[in-house]
Amino acid sequence: MLGFAGCNDDENKDNIPPTLREYEAPVFMYGKTREEVKASVPYAYSGASETSLYFEGKGIVKEYIYIFEDDKVYSCGSILSDLYVYYLHTYLSQLYIYLEYRPGQRMYVYESEDKSLSIGLYPLNDGLAAVEYLKN
């Protein structure tokens, strides 16, 4: 995302870069079981671990992850290239209330207007970043 070939003002309505229009947040299903998530999400199932379910990404998202605690969805997230962090920060700041940057974790933190949802944007290893959604 170092630049956008062919980008002009008409393509950049609402100050959202064209590539970020391809960002689709995961369907948040707090409290749902593994079976309910598998049956409900619009993504292709790609695997599981003891604590998570993995689904193929869409658009710029490489993978969607649903994390479970006590066999219920605790959080979910999208994994994408860390090249999108700057643009995602700007984009998420338009959608949610930007709260703070946590330098030790290199994490941007946001909250929904109704304060029901917390969102974290942070880098992972190997050139990847995560956007994680948690119920407050």
Where are the predicted features?
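Beta-strand residues in well-ordered beta-sheet regions across diverse protein folds
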Residues: 76-77, 120, 132
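Assembly/interface hotspot detector across virion components, adhesins/toxins, and nucleic-acid enzymes
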Residues: 45-46, 96-101, 121
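Short Gly/Thr-rich strand-loop-strand
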Residues: 92-113
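Short helix/turn-capping signatures at newly exposed starts of structured segments
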Residues: 7-94, 136
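C-terminal motif of bacterial Sec signal peptides marking the signal peptidase cleavage site
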Residues: 2-6
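Short, exposed beta-strand-loop hairpins at the edges of beta-sheets
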Residues: 108-128
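Edge beta-strand at a domain terminus
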Residues: 127-136
